[in-house]
Amino acid sequence: MNYSHNEIEKKWQDYWEANKTFKTSDNLGQKKFYALDMFPYPSGAGLHVGHPEGYTATDIISRYKRMLGYNVLHPMGWDAFGLPAEQYALDTGNDPREFTKENIQTFKRQIKELGFSYDWDREVNTTDPEYYKWTQWIFIQLYNKGLAYVDEVAVNWCPALGTVLSNEEVIDGVSERGGHPVYRRPMKQWVLKITEYADRLLEDLDELDWPESLKDMQRNWIGRSEGASVAFDVKDYNEQIEVFTTRPDTIYGASFLVLSPEHELVDLITTEDNKDDVEAYQKEAAKKSDLERTGLSKEKSGVFTGAYAVNPLSGQQVPIWIADYVLSTYGTGAVMAVPSGDQRDYEFAKTFDLPIIEVIEGGDMSKEAYTGDGPHINSGELNGLYNEAAIEKAIELLENKNAGTRKVNYKLRDWLFSRQRYWGEPIPVIHWEDGSMTTVPEDELPLLLPETDEIKPSGTGESPLANIDEFVNVVDEATGMKGRRETNTMPQWAGSCWYYLRYIDPDNEQMLADPEKLKHWLPVDLYIGGVEHAVLHLLYARFWHKVLFDLGVVPTKEPFQKLFNQGMILGEGNEKMSKSKGNVINPDDIVKSHGADTLRLYEMFMGPLDAAIAWSENGLDGSRRFLDRIWRLLITEDGSISNKVVNNHSKALDKSYHQTVKKVTEDYNSLNFNTAISQLMVFINDCYKAEEIYKPYIEGFIKMLAPIAPHISEELWSRLGHDETITYQPWPSYDEALLVDDEIEIVVQVNGKVRAKINVSKDIAKEEMEQIALDNEHVKSEIEGKDIKKVIAVPKKLVNIVAK
C-alpha cells in the first residue's frame, strides 16, 4: 500500500502549527544554532523549484540540530521593498502595499506546504513600519558617525524608470530590469562611506568559513592596491592633476595623461580650438555604462584637450587627453599613460600616434607593451634598477620633490544609497531653509511612507514623494523655520542589511534587539543562499554589521560565520528556467502530484548541493518510489505496523544500521545530503533482505529520514506507538565496534581448487577453522576415499586441504 501524501502532509502541518512545534525557546543557557536563509523578494510569480533547494538544506540542518539538543533559530521573512513591486503598481495602477501583501500570503502558503520548520512568530517584513523604524534608526547612526553624506555624483540615470540605478543594476548600458537605456548625469545623492571600512572588510574575510571563490569575489570588488599618488602641474594654469599608479617606476615612460570626460578640470583647461570636439565626446560618453566604457575589446576613443602637463621627474611636457575608458568614479579620474608598460595605453598611443618610450628592458615595443621585470632604461636615476627597487626609489624621488607620496588605493566606491522611487524606506532627514540639515528625532521614528495614488516618478530626478506637499513641507515648532523632508528613499539593500538581527528579537519596541539575545545568537552559524549575492548584499551587510559593532550594538565583528551557496536547478534541457522559455516548474504542482517530502528528497538527491543540475521527472518519480518503499516495508494493507518489526534484537542488521548512522551523521555535518540519502537507501535494501527488523533500528532510521522527509517520518513515528512529535527526539548514535562484521567469509580449497565458501566467526581459532572446513558437505564429497596429507589454515582467509 502506498501512502497518501496529501492527507499525511496536511495532518502534520496542521499539528506543527497548532502546537507551535518549531517555536524557538528564549532559554539563553542552552547551546544554540542559528540557521538562516536569504529571505526572498515576494514576487507575483510565487515560489519556483529553485527556492526550496536552499530552504530544504537549512531545514535539514535545523531539524538535525534540534535532535542534537540545540536551541535552533530558524526564521523566515520578506524582503518586500524595491523596484519590482513599484513597477507592477505603475503598470497596473494597484497599490504596492496590496500587491506585496497578497504575494507574501502566496509565498507563505507555499513555504508552509513544503513543511519547513520556521518559527513564524519571528517573521519580519521590511515594509512594516515597525521594522523600517530600525532601518531608519541605523541610517541616523551612520549619519551621526559621518558615514552618510550628500555628494554630487555622476549617476546612472534611467529616464524610463525615472530613477537612478546602482552600477550593479545596469548591464551593457541598459537597466537590468526592463532593459531601458541608461545615461550618466551628475545629481545630488546620499552616499554611505563603505570605503572607510575597506581594510577591515578585506582582512576579516580570512576568519570566515566561506567558499574561497566567494571570498575572492569580495577581495576583487574591494580591490586594494599599493602604489603612489603623483601630482602633474598643468602648464599655464595654477592647477595640478593627481594620478594614482601602482607603477611609479615607469613615470619616465609617461608620454601623455588621460582624464575621464567628467573630470573637473576638463572644461577649464580645454583650448578654444578643441572645445567642440571635447563637448561632443563628453555627450557620447554620458550615454555609456561603466562596463561599456572599460571593455578591453572595445575600440579606443579619445580627444585631445589642447593642454599640457609637466612630468614631475623628467620635466617633459605631456599632452592631456580625455577618454571614456577612464572613469571619474575610480581613483582620481586621471591616469598617467605609459604605453610601453600598459596594453590599454599602448593601443591608445598606437591609435592616436602618441610617443611610446621604452623604460624597462625585455619587451618588443613594435608588438605590444611589456609588463614584466627588467632593468630600467631611459629613466634617469632609476636606470639599471629592477622593478621592486625602482618603485621604492621613484617614491623617494617624488616625495623629495613634494610631487608624490606612497598611497593605498581601492577599487571599492562609496555606496550610492538614495533612490528616486516611492516604494522604499523614507530617509529620515530634513533640509532647512537656512541650508542646514538635521535627522528626524529618534523618538519620532518611524517616519512613515505616506500612502498615495500618485507614485509615478517625477521625471526631474526627485522621487514621487516630492509631489506630496503634506509629507515634504515641515515647520520647526520651536523656531518657525521652514524645511523640506528628504524625498529620496533607501535602496532595497537597506532592509536586507540587518534583517538577521531583527529575527533575534522581532517584537522589541525599545531597541533594535536585546543585547543579551544578540550575544547569545550571533554570529549566524549557517547562511545559505545564491551566489548572485556574493558581493553586494553580503558586503553591505558586513559593512553595517561592523558599524553596529563599533557602536556597541552587536557583539561580533562579523554577521555570518559559515556561508554556503546552493547551485542552480536548470530546466530539463540544461537551460536556465525562465517564463519566456516556458520551462518553469511550480512547486505547487509537485506537492500535489508527488508530495512535499518527495520534492525535498529529490532536490537533495539530485547531486551535490552546490552543483547546477537539470530537473528530471524520472528522478522525481524515483524519489517518490523510495518513500513508497519505506512505507510498504513498515505498514501493512490494513495500516498496522508490519510484524517484520520486532522488539527482540536480531543482530542481522547491526553493521548496516551502525554504518548508516555514522555515514548520515557525517554527511549531514558536511551538507552532503545526496550521499546521506544513498546510505538511507542501502539500509532500506538491507531491511527488505532481512527476515526481522529490530524496532530501535527502524526508529533510528526514521529519525535520520525526518530532517529530509518530515511528514512521512512523523506519521511512521506516530504509528510505531509514539505520542510526541519526532522533532525533539535524540539523534541516534552508533557503536564503532559494530561497524565491522562479527563473521567473515573464508575460502576452502581442495588441492588448490576452491570447493566452498563458508562464514565463520572473525575470532575463530585455526583448529576450529580446519574442522569446520572438513565437515563441509561439498568438501566431504571431494575428499571421500582420499588420503588427507595436509590441512593448511590461514586465519581470516582460507583453508587448503591436500588430499591424494
From Swiss-Prot:
It is found in: Cytoplasm. Gene3D superfamilies: 3.10.20.590, HUPs, Isoleucyl-tRNA Synthetase, Domain 1. A motif ('HIGH' region) lies at residues 40-51. One of its GO terms (biological process) is leucyl-tRNA aminoacylation. One of its GO terms (molecular function) is leucine-tRNA ligase activity. It comes from Staphylococcus saprophyticus subsp. saprophyticus (strain ATCC 15305 / DSM 20229 / NCIMB 8711 / NCTC 7292 / S-41). One of its GO terms (cellular component) is cytosol. It comes from the Bacteria. ATP binds at residue 579. InterPro entries: aa-tRNA-synth_I_CS, aa-tRNA-synth_Ia, Leu-tRNA-ligase, Leu_tRNA-synth_edit, M/V/L/I-tRNA-synth_anticd-bd, Methionyl/Leucyl_tRNA_Synth, Rossmann-like_a/b/a_fold, tRNAsynth_Ia_anticodon-bd. Keywords: Aminoacyl-tRNA synthetase, ATP-binding, Cytoplasm, Ligase, Nucleotide-binding, Protein biosynthesis. This is Leucine--tRNA ligase. It catalyses: tRNA(Leu) + L-leucine + ATP = L-leucyl-tRNA(Leu) + AMP + diphosphate. CDD domains: Anticodon_Ia_Leu_BEm, LeuRS_core. Belongs to the class-I aminoacyl-tRNA synthetase family. A motif ('KMSKS' region) lies at residues 576-580. Transmembrane segments: none annotated. The lineage of its organism: Bacteria, Bacillati, Bacillota, Bacilli, Bacillales. Its EC number is 6.1.1.4.
